[in-house]
């Protein structure tokens, strides 16, 4: 699953590829200090957006 986040500190969007929302949250907080979950996207949408993926 591709979980889309927005980080308020850096002002960037990113995808976290994880099996669950809890896992995605842990990964997002590892890389960013203020991530906010936005939505879940399929692989095609995530690829089209071109955001970094963690």
Per-range role (PLM):
Residues 1-12:
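Short aromatic-glycine-(Arg/Gly/Cys) micro-motifs in beta-strand/loop hairpins
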Residues 16-34:
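Short, flexible N-terminal segments of the mature chain
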Residues 29-54:
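Short, mixed-charge low-complexity intrinsically disordered segments
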Residues 12-16, 45-48:
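Short, surface-exposed beta-strand/loop "edge" segments at domain boundaries and coil↔beta transitions
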């Amino acid at each position: 699953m591709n979980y889309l986040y927005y980080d308020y500190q850096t002002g960037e969007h990113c995808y976290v590829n994880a099996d669950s929302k809890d896992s995605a949250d842990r990964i997002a907080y590892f890389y960013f200090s203020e991530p906010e979950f936005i939505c879940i996207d399929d692989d095609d949408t995530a690829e089209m957006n071109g955001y970094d993926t963690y």
